[in-house]
């Protein structure tokens, strides 16, 4: 998944 700082669920995908 792409880095998504707007969605806590996807926030973990951010470096």
UniProtKB/Swiss-Prot annotation:
Localization (cell): Secreted; Target cell membrane
Any one Gene Ontology BP term: killing of cells of another organism
UniProt tissue specificity: Expressed by the venom gland.
Origin: domain of life: Eukaryota
A GO molecular-function descriptor: toxin activity
Keyword Calcium in annotation: no
Keywords, ordered alphabetically: Cardiotoxin, Cytolysis, Disulfide bond, Membrane, Secreted, Target cell membrane, Target membrane, Toxin
CC per GO annotation: extracellular region; membrane; other organism cell membrane
Role: Shows cytolytic activity on many different cells by forming pore in lipid membranes. In vivo, increases heart rate or kills the animal by cardiac arrest. In addition, it binds to heparin with high affinity, interacts with Kv channel-interacting protein 1 (KCNIP1) in a calcium-independent manner, and binds to integrin alpha-V/beta-3 (ITGAV/ITGB3) with moderate affinity.
Subunit record text: Monomer in solution; Homodimer and oligomer in the presence of negatively charged lipids forming a pore with a size ranging between 20 and 30 Angstroms.
The family this protein is said to belong to: Belongs to the three-finger toxin family. Short-chain subfamily. Type IA cytotoxin sub-subfamily.
Listed name of the protein: Cytotoxin 1f
């Amino acid at each position: 998944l792409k880095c998504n700082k707007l969605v806590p669920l996807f926030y973990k995908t951010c470096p």
